[in-house]
């Protein structure tokens, strides 16, 4: 939790973490920065007004009794995450530009040229498609970018943050807008899980990649991967599900792979 709360708050969060349930219901504590929010659920115990009051006084976080949430005071500076992850989404917008956090400029105004459409909706190469061990087909993110670069040209498209980064105890999510040739094309929320607070920055990049994949769906890029019939045919013709054994734990399970690939350490096929 030390990367989520400022040092003044940490001194009292240790006490607060012992107070989870109020009338048998879990208490969800929200800690807000100017542009990011963090959800923290203590481990066990009963919420104490005295503890929450001291927590409020020493962490610069305002407690609202009717909502059981904490919000920052208006006259205080943004809380840092141990001088780490900060979300600076409020950028200055040029006079001639558009604020893509709010603008829908160009959405559905006209279709792109036939040449661009042909590049975006071109069938995928079989060799480009990968499969995860759990059987999910996917296209590597770099290949989405190559398709967009081929269709719009490098610099002719971009992802604009739309809204704030939301960081919970297990995942990061943020909404992005795909802008092509100065027009809003699609809006999607990307999400990415993480297992350690040190990985929040990396998870935020994974969140952006996930949003790009979802935005490309509206342009018809890799649309086959959303078609159940195509997925079944591809897996039947190009993939195989086999039993593998973990050489360290000796546990066996069934995993998917492409027919021409082999599993690497610590797995071996049995």
From Swiss-Prot:
Where it sits in the cell: the answer is:
Mitochondrion matrix, Mitochondrion nucleoid
- Identify the Pfam families for this entry: Mgm101p
Keywords associated with the record: DNA damage, DNA repair, DNA-binding, Mitochondrion, Mitochondrion nucleoid, Transit peptide
Annotated GO molecular function terms are: DNA binding; single-stranded DNA binding
Query: Which biological process, per GO, is one annotated for this protein?
Result: mitochondrial DNA repair
Give the range of the organelle targeting sequence. Answer: 1-35
Q: Which InterPro entries match?
A: Mgm101
Any one of the GO CC terms: mitochondrial chromosome
Transmembrane spans? none
Functionally, this protein is described as follows: Performs an essential function in the repair of oxidatively damaged mtDNA that is required for the maintenance of the mitochondrial genome. Binds to DNA.
What is the similarity comment for this entry? Answer: Belongs to the MGM101 family.
Q: Provide the protein name.
A: Mitochondrial genome maintenance protein mgm101
Native species of this protein? Schizosaccharomyces pombe (strain 972 / ATCC 24843) (Fission yeast)
**Species classification:** Eukaryota, Fungi, Dikarya, Ascomycota, Taphrinomycotina
Q: What's the name of its gene?
A: mgm101
């Amino acid at each position: 939790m030390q990367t989520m709360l400022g040092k003044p708050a940490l001194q009292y969060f240790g006490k607060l973490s012992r107070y989870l349930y109020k009338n048998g219901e879990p208490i969800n504590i929200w800690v807000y920065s100017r542009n990011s929010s963090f959800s923290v659920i203590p481990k066990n115990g009963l919420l104490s007004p005295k503890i929450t009051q001291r927590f409020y006084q020493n962490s610069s976080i305002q407690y609202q009794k009717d909502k059981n949430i904490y919000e920052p005071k208006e006259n205080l500076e943004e809380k840092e995450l141990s001088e780490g992850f900060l979300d600076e989404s409020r950028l200055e917008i040029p006079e001639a530009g558009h604020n893509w956090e709010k603008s829908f400029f160009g959405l559905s105004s006209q279709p792109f040229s036939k040449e661009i459409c042909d590049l975006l909706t071109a069938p995928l190469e079989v060799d480009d498609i990968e499969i995860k061990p759990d059987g999910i087909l996917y296209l590597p993110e770099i290949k989405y970018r190559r398709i967009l670069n081929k269709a719009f040209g490098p610099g002719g498209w971009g992802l604009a943050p739309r809204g704030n980064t939301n960081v919970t105890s297990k995942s990061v999510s943020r909404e992005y807008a795909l802008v092509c040739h100065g027009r809003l094309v699609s809006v999607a929320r990307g999400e990415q899980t993480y297992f350690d607070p040190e990985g929040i920055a990396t998870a935020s990049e994974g969140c952006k990649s996930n949003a790009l994949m979802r935005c490309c769906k509206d342009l018809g890029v890799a649309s086959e991967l959303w078609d159940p019939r195509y997925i079944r045919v591809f897996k039947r013709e190009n993939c195989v599900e086999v039993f593998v054994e973990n050489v360290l734990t000796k546990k066996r399970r069934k995993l998917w792979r492409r027919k021409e690939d082999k599993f690497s350490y610590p797995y071996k096929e049995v």
